[in-house]
Structures are given as C-alpha cells and as structure tokens.
Curated annotation (Swiss-Prot):
InterPro entries: MFS, MFS_dom, MFS_Na/Anion_cotransporter, MFS_trans_sf, Sugar_P_transporter. Residues 10-20 have a biased composition (Polar residues). Disulfide bonds: none annotated. Its main location: membrane. Disruption phenotype: Cells lacking this gene fail to grow on L-galactonate as sole carbon source. Probably responsible for the transport of L-galactonate from the periplasm across the inner membrane. Is essential for growth on L-galactonate as the sole carbon source. It catalyses: L-galactonate(in) + H(+)(in) = L-galactonate(out) + H(+)(out). One of its GO terms (cellular component) is plasma membrane. GO terms for molecular function: transmembrane transporter activity. The chain crosses the membrane at residues 43-63, 72-92, 108-128, 175-195, 197-217, 260-280, 296-316, 333-353, 360-380, 395-415, 423-443. Induction: Highly up-regulated during growth on L-galactonate. It comes from Escherichia coli (strain K12). Residues 1-42, 93-107, 196, 281-295, 354-359, 416-422 are periplasmic. This is Probable L-galactonate transporter.
Length: 453
C-alpha cells in the first residue's frame, strides 16, 4: 500500500503536519500534542465499538444454544463442535494474519476482517442444518482473526511505552463488556425477532462499523508526524520501528523460549475464557433450570466482573511501572497471580448450591483471568521489538485458540455423557494453573529483534 498524503480539515485527528512545525523539546522532554490526543481518542472509541460487536457475535450462539438445539435437532456435543470450529479457524488464521498486519496495517486488516465476519454472522441466521452452520462458523473465525492483533498494533503505534497499560485495559474491557451486555440484549432480541433475526441484525450492524473504521482510521506510517509527535510516541522505547519481518525472521520466533512460554501460558487463559463464553448460559439453564430471560440477566454478571478485571489491570500495571518496577516483571506478576486465583475459583464452582453463588464464583474466576489476560497482551508491548508485535501477538493468539477450541467440544461431550459440568470445570482449572507455570518457567527474556542478534 502506498503512503497516503492526507489533506483534510485541520481540525481532524488525522491531519498531517510538517516535522518542522514544532521543534523537538530539549533535555528529553516529550509532549503529547492535541492532534495525537484526538487520534488516540478516535482510535480507542472505534476499537471499543469493534470489540463490543465482536463479542456480541461470539456470544450469539452461546445465548441461543438451547433454542438452536431444539429447532435444528442438535446435541450438546454438536453445539460444542460449532463453538470449537470457530475457535479452531480463528486460531489457524492467526498465523498469516500477523505478517499481513505488519505489512498492510490495522486499517485494511481490521476493516476487511470486520466486514467478512459480520457477513458470515448475518448468514448464520439463514442456516438450516449442522453442515451449513459449520461453514459459516469457519468463515466467522477467519474474519475475526485480525481483531486482537490489530488492537495491539494500534495501541503500540499511538501510545508510548509508559502509557499503554490503561488503553490496553480499556480495549480488553470492551470485549468483556460486549460479552456482559450480550446475554440480556441477545435474549431480548430473540424474544422479539427469534434467533435468526438476532444473527442477521448484529451482522448488519458490524458491516456498517467496518465501513466506519476504514473511513476514519489511518495507519501511523500514513500520517506525517511532527518531530515532537515522533518523540512522544517513541519515548521509552528500546527498539526502533523497522521494516516488517521476513518469513525467515517470523519462522525464527518458533525457536524462541519466551515465545513458547507466551503460547502455552496464554492457552491456559483462553481455555478458561472460551469455556465460560461458550457454555455459561447453557450451564445456568441446565444446572439451575433458569428460563431464557433469567439466564440473560444472570449470565451478564460474571462478564462484568471480567471487564472490571481488565480495567483494574491497566491501573495496577501502570502504578507498578511508575513505582519503579521493570515493565516485564510487573506484567508477569499480574499474569501469574491472576491465573492461579482464577484456577482456584473455577475449581470451587462445582461446589456451589445456588445459581447466585455459582455466578459470583464464576465472576471472580473471570475477574482474575481477564486481569491476567490484559497483562499478557501488555507483555507484548514491553518485551517484544516494535516491528514484531503483530507477529508475536498473532502467534500467541494462534496457539491459545487452538487450545481453546477444545474447551467447547470437550465440555459438550462431558455434558452429553455425564449430564454434569463438574468434570469440565475441574479440567479447566487445571489447564489454567498449567498456563501460569509456563509463564513462570519459560518467559524470562524479552524477544529481541533478530537483526540485532
């Protein structure tokens, strides 16, 4: 893609300016310009709405679980397979997504991804059998693949290293807010227009948002920044911005011990997150005999806890770094503590005797796992060279979603064979704890630019 010379209203967030406009401040002093503030605000608002729509899409099948099973005659294992095939397609698509994102940037990648995942979401409302559903779920998984790597890339591009904690928490919280508002919103939509109308409506909204993203957002390399703006954005960064990775450099990441620690560790986080995302409404309906309306309200509560965990993480990591703790160490502490606590709460869930007790325990498990997960993405910002962030993020996501793809189908199979979620929750807690151990023993050194090795 050629570099754009943007000539728009000077009040716009993305108006270019000559590097000679403002001198670089002396003595290392950096300032955030009004234009950079507007760019950051615009980018974060667009990412927020994209993340909410993204998780409305992901939650739709979970909320409509029992209704779709009855209409299409599907078993719990088949529903689990539909949930798993999405995750598997999403994970595999992460591999080409990273290098493409490093080359094409978030504007094109997220715009196209959002358009196609929303198109397949709308098509989900038109299926009539299991095979058709599998195909549209695969399409959705591929389309959604750029979402998180694009978010990481946008934040890495438009915030300097000391100010990325809160925007990362905000971005991640948006996804959980999407999950939290999904059950009551989707349940209400189903009561009014049925599950088919729900899928189609959400898909159309996503298509409009995709068009808005492409029209409003600009990649950093396509904006002519002043010297002061460059100084602000690069402040504290050890690694300079360079050319995208070659295939050989990308392949070399799989020989890096820290990369494997991130892959295995984040797999523990995504297994837990995806199990609850896929099966929480079904669990509440099956274990506690809740109706659709009550399920919609109760299922929202744990995900609000998860959103809170993401937001709290941003403040905690920024506070630790400003207090003198090394950025990598601050993220690792949050990751490991959050994962062990989440595992403990998940293991206690089967002991709950009331739906409210179960919801609160799951809420604490999600608070802790999303607290940890936010630092996993934050770790990429501080432990990885800038030109490699998208590739590392996509590889991490690839591994974690391959692992997470087993959670729905394993859970569905266990429910079909034991008529209980107990064993599925125990397995989940153990996987989470194993992920924490991967961060302890494998993630010890930053991932440096191979050109400097």
């Amino acid at each position: 893609m050629e570099k754009e010379n943007i000539t728009i209203d000077p009040r716009s967030s993305f108006t270019p300016s000559s590097s000679a406009d403002i001198p670089v401040p002396p003595d290392g002093l950096v300032q955030r310009s009004t234009r950079i503030k507007r760019i950051q605000t615009t980018a974060m608002l667009l990412l927020f709405f994209a993340a909410v729509i993204n998780y409305l899409d992901r939650s739709s099948l979970s909320v409509a679980n029992l209704t779709i099973r009855e209409e299409l005659g599907l078993s719990a294992t088949e529903i689990g397979a539909l949930l798993s095939v999405f995750s598997l397609a999403y994970g595999i698509a992460q591999l080409p997504c990273g290098p493409l994102l490093d080359r094409k940037g978030p504007r094109l990648m997220l715009g196209l991804g959002m358009f196609f995942w929303s198109l397949f979401q709308a098509m989900s409302g038109m299926v009539h059998n299991f095979t058709q559903f599998v195909l549209v779920r695969i399409g959705m998984g591929i389309g959604e693949a750029p979402m998180n790597p694009c978010g990481v890339k946008v934040i890495n591009d438009w915030f300097n290293i000391k100010e990325r904690g809160r925007p990362m928490g905000f971005f991640n919280a948006a996804s959980t807010i999407g999950v939290a508002v999904s059950p009551p919103i989707l349940a209400a939509m189903m009561l009014v227009m049925g599950w088919r109308g729900m899928f189609i409506t959400i898909g159309v909204l996503g298509i409009f948002l995709a068009i808005g993203w492409y029209m409003l957002y600009r990649n950093r390399e396509h904006v002519e920044l002043t010297a002061v703006e460059q100084a602000y954005l690069n402040a504290g960064s050890v690694n300079a911005r360079r050319d995208p990775l070659s295939f050989a450099e990308w392949r070399s990441l799989f020989r890096n011990r820290t990369m494997w620690g991130m892959m295995l560790g984040f797999s523990g986080i995504n297994y837990t997150a995806w199990l609850y995302l896929a099966w929480l409404p079904g669990y509440l309906q099956t274990a506690y005999n809740l109706d659709l309306k009550s399920t919609g309200l109760m299922a929202a509560i744990p995900f609000l806890f998860g959103a809170a965990g993401m937001l709290v993480n941003g403040y905690v990591t920024d506070w630790l770094v400003k207090g003198g703790m090394a950025p990598i160490k601050s993220r690792k502490i949050c990751i490991i503590a959050g994962m062990f606590c989440s595992a403990a709460f998940t293991l206690i869930v089967p002991q709950a005797t009331t739906s409210m007790t179960a919801v609160l325990l799951i809420g604490m498990a999600l608070f802790c796992i999303h607290f940890a997960g936010t630092s996993c993405w934050g770790l990429i910002h501080v432990a990885v060279a800038s030109r490699m962030t998208a590739s590392v993020g996509s590889i991490q996501n690839f591994a974690s979603f391959i692992c997470a793809s087993f959670a729905p189908i394993i859970t569905g199979f266990i429910v079909d064979t034991t008529h209980s979620f107990r064993l599925a929750l125990i397995i989940c807690g153990c996987v989470t704890a194993a992920g924490a151990l991967a961060y302890i023993f494998l993630v010890r050194q930053p991932i440096n630019d191979p050109r400097k090795d």
